[in-house]
């Protein structure tokens, strides 16, 4: 019997031929290269109004196929004006979302291979490369060996630190339920974090069914670090009232100022009260690749889980979070659901890792590929040089601020985030921020420190240099000179 071609069965949907794909692929790379070359000519912060992009596009999908060249033309003329240019050297506002050339190219391979790595069986290379690369990172960053795959612990790539803390909360919840007497409700389980902790901790408690009111936000000191004595008192109070402390999130590098909680002291308290300790080092963690910044790891050996984001500062494009646990069996037990159609026959022959049991979704992308490309393309020494360069530039910027009479530092931890303000009230500083961002040449954000409106400048872009930061400083001073006191 003659075999039918797919086009005989479903018709030809208009696939590109291999040659068309090759030609269009070259065009796409050329477009990106041109974009990077001219990126400084665009306003860093998009100038479009809400709804402008949507109203510029057809309200209904095209009935017939369109040429790739037409799609690229619309990308240039309609989409690009609505882009805030995260890869621009003048983007200083938020923590960066690095997109280095090796990581971009790795994403092309990942998309082309089209891997769905939920099980070892569905792509052995996807699983085993992830295990290897995460072990590499333990070594690169001087993390505790308990996080290596060869022991009871291990690592997994999540999409973000938000997913990592959710997994940690669920694992802690389930572990506590197996130890505690049945209560019939989860309302007695109490968690703790600093008031400077990321908002994802509160969201995790809501999603996990624990309730936001069950998360105690502990006040911070003048440096933004959790006040240990207040945490100790709150735990004692909750125990006295018949509640069960079960989870503490420590922050190493807060979103607002890069402040760090006293992890070692918190870890001892967590152990004393049988609490799961999760350490969130989403931004600052990458700095530990440099031995001189390993103080950031102090106390992590006491953690049950730890995470950081290579997509922020390790030259790896979004999304990529490295999430480590001390005991992988606890995490798997909390998240595993095994219907018959997901049984892995290879697991009967010898143990294999099925990363679907380490995360919330079933499906998963081949994220390890871009980490592998980045680490091999730059080497550990290259990544260290990159990080040290950013810290050196941030140090210089902080010194410029300190030397200027009308300006003052409001927070600087010695890494790559500088918080500062000009003399005057909050309204004057807010006006300065708006004036700076309206220039289009740079983009800053703000935070409130001890009630004072402060501007944030984060040095972390792939294409940033001392010269671009010096130019930014000149823009800031020029704008400040026009703001009345």
Describe each model-derived feature in a short phrase:
Residues 325, 420-424, 459-461:
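Short beta-strand-to-loop capping motifs
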Residues 412, 417, 439-456:
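Conserved PLP cofactor-binding pocket of PLP-dependent enzymes
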């Amino acid at each position: 019997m003659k075999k039918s071609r797919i086009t005989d069965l479903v018709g030809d949907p208009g696939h590109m031929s291999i040659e068309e794909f090759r030609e269009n692929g070259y065009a796409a790379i050329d477009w990106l290269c041109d974009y990077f070359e001219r990126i400084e000519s665009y306003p860093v912060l998009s100038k479009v109004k809400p709804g402008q992009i949507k109203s510029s596009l057809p309200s209904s999908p095209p009935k017939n196929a369109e040429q790739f060249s037409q799609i690229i033309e619309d990308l240039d003329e309609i989409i690009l004006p609505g882009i805030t240019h995260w890869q621009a050297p003048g983007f200083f506002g938020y923590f960066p979302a690095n997109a280095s050339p090796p990581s971009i190219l790795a994403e092309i391979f990942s998309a082309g291979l089209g891997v769905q790595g939920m099980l070892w069986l569905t792509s052995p290379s996807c699983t085993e490369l992830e295990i290897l690369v995460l072990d590499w990172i333990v070594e690169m960053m001087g993390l505790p060996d308990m996080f290596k795959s060869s022991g009871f612990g291990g690592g997994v790539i999540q999409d973000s630190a938000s997913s990592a803390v959710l997994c940690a909360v669920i694992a802690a919840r389930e572990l506590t339920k197996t130890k505690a007497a049945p209560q019939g409700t989860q309302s007695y389980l109490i968690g703790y974090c600093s008031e400077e902790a990321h908002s994802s901790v509160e969201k995790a408690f809501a999603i996990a069914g624990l309730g936001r009111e069950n998360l105690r936000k502990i006040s911070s000191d003048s440096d933004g670090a959790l006040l240990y004595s207040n945490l100790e008192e709150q735990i004692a109070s909750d125990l006295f009232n018949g509640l069960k402390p079960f989870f503490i999130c420590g922050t190493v590098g807060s979103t607002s100022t890069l402040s760090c909680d006293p992890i070692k002291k918190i870890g001892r308290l967590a152990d004393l009260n049988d609490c799961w300790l999760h350490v969130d080092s989403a931004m600052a963690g990458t700095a530990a690749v440099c031995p001189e910044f390993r103080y950031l790891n102090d106390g992590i050996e006491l953690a049950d889980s730890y995470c950081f984001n290579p997509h922020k500062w390790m030259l790896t494009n979004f999304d990529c979070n490295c999430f480590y646990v001390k005991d992988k069996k606890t995490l798997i037990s909390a998240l595993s659901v095994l219907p018959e159609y997901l049984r892995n026959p290879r697991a009967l022959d010898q143990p294999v890792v099925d990363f679907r049991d380490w995360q919330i979704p079933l499906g998963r992308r081949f994220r390890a590929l871009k980490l592998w490309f980045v680490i091999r393309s730059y080497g550990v020494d290259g990544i260290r040089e990159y990080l040290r360069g950013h810290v050196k530039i941030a140090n210089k910027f902080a010194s410029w601020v300190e030397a200027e009479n009308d300006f003052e530092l409001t927070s600087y931890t010695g890494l790559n985030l500088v918080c500062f303000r000009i003399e005057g009230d909050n309204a004057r500083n807010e006006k300065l921020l708006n004036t700076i961002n309206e220039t289009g040449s740079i983009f800053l954000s703000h935070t409130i420190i001890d009630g004072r409106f402060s501007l944030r400048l984060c040095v972390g872009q792939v294409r940033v240099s001392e010269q671009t930061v010096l130019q930014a400083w000149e823009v800031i001073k020029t704008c400040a000179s026009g703001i009345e006191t």
